[in-house]
């Protein structure tokens, strides 16, 4: 996706549209820089969260995240619960623990769990470095914890997992037009 920066690409993931429609064009956008082509009843471009809320008003819908910018892109008024981990470097296990508890207690119909640690590592140590791959191994443990919580909640047979990111990176940066910055993994299971 272009531009290969966080708010633009997370908006694309949650809204199912590109910047020419949702209007977010900058890394840290809190509001669209361009007028959104459509607004929902909450004054934001339609999101997957709002579409589910409209279809199933009673649904439990959550979003837990480490990067604070996520809250501007998910339509928090359509969520049942949202939680921001203030400092993922000081408490790297907090998001996985919170997500696991939330899943077991509330059995959400939809939950987004957004980790920021790999992005931080890419900017400090570099992308495609041993440190970056160590961070991904750490993240794999948290994904396993979340999968186990889904199993423990008795939801595994009805769950689809999607693992992706907002953008790639090159050296210690992102936001450019290279293939390494634009391409992301997209893994679906269930």
Annotated model-derived regions:
Residues 138-179, 186:
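Metal-dependent active-site segment of extracytoplasmic phospho-/sulfohydrolases and closely related
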Residues 36-98, 106:
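A substrate-binding/cap region within the structured catalytic cores of diverse enzymes
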Residues 2-5, 19-20, 67-71, 117-121, ...:
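Solvent-exposed loop/turn segments at secondary-structure junctions
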Residues 68-83, 97-141, 145:
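Active-site His/acidic residue clusters
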Residues 8, 55-62, 105-111, 155-161, ...:
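Loop/turn elements at helix/coil->beta-strand transitions in domains of secreted/extracellular proteins
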Residues 12-14, 27, 177-190:
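Substrate-binding rim/cap in mid-to-C-terminal beta-strand-loop elements of soluble/periplasmic
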Residues 1, 10-11, 33-40, 51, ...:
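Second-shell loop/turn segments in exported
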Residues 1-56:
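Active-site nucleophile/metal-coordination loop of metallo-enzymes that catalyze phosphate/sulfate
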